[in-house]
């Protein structure tokens, strides 16, 4: 099976998933993809860093900032603005791929706490940008679907870090 056909089949599969199933799938996938990065964090970096305002915040502060404010702000800045602007450019071939990479690159370059974290957030940026593009094509609230995924991801991670 050729590469373009595989991509098209995957895209069709995601397009036909219900919103709840898609969100669940992307959340699970985001943690599966994190596994090799987790190995790198544990073996090569003791602290990935992060913004001091979040590191020093209380648990509720971390939830408020990381699960509400950051996802809304970052979705607006790193998915909505670049994707909507780049969507207006007349590119005939692989436009979605180009837009996805640019948006993901912007997202990852603002998470420069460590090189490994930049690489990990680039992959997360691909998931979030893909989601925005997909739900824009479905004409079903792409901004809020991305915010929900990002919020859930950050909330789950905050609870995991709090418990362990």
PLM ranges: what are they?
Residues 31, 35, 63-164:
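Transmembrane helix-loop-helix hairpins at the membrane interface
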Residues 2-70, 83-89:
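Juxtamembrane helix-loop-helix connectors linking adjacent transmembrane helices
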């Amino acid at each position: 099976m050729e590469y373009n056909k595989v991509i098209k089949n995957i895209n069709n599969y995601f397009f036909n998933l219900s919103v709840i199933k898609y969100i669940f799938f992307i959340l699970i996938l985001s943690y599966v993809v994190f596994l090799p990065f987790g190995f790198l964090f544990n073996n090569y970096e003791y602290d990935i860093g992060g913004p001091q305002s979040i590191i020093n915040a209380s648990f509720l502060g971390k939830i408020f900032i990381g699960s509400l404010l950051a996802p809304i702000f970052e979705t607006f800045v790193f998915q909505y603005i670049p994707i909507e602007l780049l969507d207006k450019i007349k590119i005939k071939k692989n436009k979605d791929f180009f837009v996805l990479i640019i948006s993901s690159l912007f997202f990852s370059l603002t998470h420069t706490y460590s090189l490994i974290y930049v690489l990990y957030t680039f992959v997360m940026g691909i998931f979030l940008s893909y989601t925005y593009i997909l739900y824009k094509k479905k004409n079903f609230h792409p901004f809020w679907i991305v915010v929900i995924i990002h919020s859930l991801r950050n909330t789950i991670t905050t609870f995991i870090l709090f418990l362990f």
